[in-house]
Amino acid sequence: MAYPLALRLLEQEGDNGKKICGCVVNLYEKMKAEFPDASLAIDGDYPYGGKAEIKVRSKDDFTVFLRIPHYTAKITLNGRELSCNRGEFLKVINPANEESCLEIFFDLSLKEVSAPGDPAYTAVKRGAVVLAEDSRKKDVPNARVHEEWNGHFLVEYSAAGSCFNKENTLQVFFRA
């Protein structure tokens, strides 16, 4: 059975061979995964929205390791805030025969990132998304992110310059 690339499975040896006992979640895009004795579903609008919700159900204890991005604001388990270290993994155990609801809230404030090798230039990120200025300025069809920064109108990089012609250009780095 194939599982989404966002997941990595954890197995353990049992009396009847290998058994799935957990998973590692690296990305928070909407998905569902069914295992023999558990299920996991992720809902939300990641990477554009500020929250992802993960529901885990299992017949036995089921371990979930969550990658905690640097732009994470907070994480809750069944409404209770958890302590976590950004840039690391958080271990959560779903008890047997229960459903757990994890919510991950992302900080989507704009962050400046210096250009590699030239700190005189800066790119702008919003959570996981790199932003760019499209030569069409505010008229960028299909853009899901619209931000103004230092007089520039920015959209997500994947939408900028999407006309694929000489007149439609994009800019990612700006003089700091």
What annotation goes with each model-predicted range?
Residues 38, 77, 82, 97-103:
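N-terminal and secondary-structure boundary signal
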Residues 62-65, 92-108, 113:
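C-terminal beta-strand-rich structural cap/linker in extracellular carbohydrate-active enzymes
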Residues 72-93, 110-117:
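Solvent-exposed beta-strand/loop surfaces of large extracellular or lumenal domains
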